Each structure stands twice: as C-alpha cells, then as structure tokens.
Design a protein with these regions (language model features):
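Exposed loop/turn and edge beta-strand positions of beta-sandwich/beta-sheet ligand-binding modules
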Residues: 66
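Residue-level signal for threonine
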Residues: 5, 72-73
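Amphipathic alpha-helical dimerization/coiled-coil segments
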Residues: 75-105
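Short, charged/polar surface micro-motifs in flexible loops or helix N-caps
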Residues: 17-21, 45-47, 75-78
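Basic amphipathic alpha-helical segments that dock to polyanions
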Residues: 36-48
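N-terminal helix-turn-helix DNA-binding core of bacterial DNA-binding proteins
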Residues: 1-37
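Beta-hairpin "wing" of winged helix-turn-helix
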Residues: 46-63, 71
Length: 105
C-alpha cells in the first residue's frame, strides 16, 4: 500500500471523524481549500474515498449550494489505520492520527 502524505492523513481522519463535506474538512484540519480539494480529488481517484451530492431539495430548503459529501471506502479505512500505526510514534508530525475528534459537530 502506498504511503499517505500528512495532508492525506489529516483529510482522511477528518472524514472518518464525521466531517464529510469540503468546508467541514477545511475547518477541522485547518488546511486551505487549495490543499483540501485537490487532496479529495486524488483520494477519490485512488479509491480511498467516495463522494455523492446531497439531494437538491435539501440545499434549496436551506438556501445554499448543494454539498458534496465524502465517505471513506474500505481501502481508505485500511490506509488510515496503517498510517495511524506508522505515525503513532511521531506525535509531533501528526498529533491527531488515529484519535477521535474532540471538536463539536
């Protein structure tokens, strides 16, 4: 399995923690949109995540653009677990890897 970048690990962890659309991932990770959205595209192309658009009626009801929601695939879960075990020894490099979120939803 290919090693994940710190960015990819942070994004996968955010999705695993329940932050499932782009702006949520940006808020949770603190990474800029110019980093998060390309990472999401690469991870989807690599089958680590899948996406789906929310129902247009939901977005219309809430008077906002439709959101694209992301979910980890089994491959994404395995890649995140492997990264968590690899980086657990280096807490300064990836302090949240493998730990549940403490942020409120």
């Amino acid at each position: 399995m290919r090693r994940l970048s710190i960015t990819a690990i942070c994004v996968l962890q955010a999705i695993a923690d329940g932050f499932q659309y782009g702006f949520d991932v940006i808020d949770q990770t603190g990474l800029p949109s110019g980093t998060v959205y390309p990472a999401l595209r690469r991870m989807e192309a690599g089958s680590l995540i899948v996406s789906k658009w929310e129902a247009p009626a939901v977005a219309q009801r809430e008077q906002r653009p439709a959101r694209k929601y992301y979910e980890l695939t089994r491959s994404g879960q395995l890649a995140l677990a492997e990264a968590a075990s690899r980086y657990r020894l280096n807490e300064r490099a990836a302090p949240r890897v493998g730990k549940p979120s403490t942020a409120r939803r």
